[in-house]
Amino acid sequence: MSKDDVIQMQGEVLENLPNATFRVKLENGHVVLGHISGKMRMHYIRILPGDKVTVELTPYDLTRARIVFRSK
């Protein structure tokens, strides 16, 4: 799978879960599980409930996502 195959969407963090995972509600109303991308972990980007985030979904599993950006 190449990087071009991902689906980018906007969402809002609903709640924190253990192991740096989050429940994210997407713009279209779906709720997915999201984990923080590696660069966000390296730079200690904090994500709290209510934050607007950009997530990447793969076409293979639309219930899990990678959080790649936190909007201000």
UniProtKB/Swiss-Prot annotation:
Query: Mind telling me which CDD domains this protein's record contains?
Result: S1_IF1
Q: Which family does it belong to?
A: Belongs to the IF-1 family.
User: Is the keyword rRNA-binding assigned to this protein?
Assistant: yes
Where does the signal sequence lie?
A: none
What is the official name of this protein in its record?
Answer: Translation initiation factor IF-1 1
Q: What Gene3D superfamilies does this protein's entry cite?
A: Nucleic acid-binding proteins
> Where found, per UniProt?
Cytoplasm
Query: What is the recorded function of this protein according to its Swiss-Prot or TrEMBL entry?
Result: One of the essential components for the initiation of protein synthesis. Stabilizes the binding of IF-2 and IF-3 on the 30S subunit to which N-formylmethionyl-tRNA(fMet) subsequently binds. Helps modulate mRNA selection, yielding the 30S pre-initiation complex (PIC). Upon addition of the 50S ribosomal subunit IF-1, IF-2 and IF-3 are released leaving the mature 70S translation initiation complex.
**What is an example of a Pfam family matching this protein?**
eIF-1a
Origin: domain of life:
Bacteria
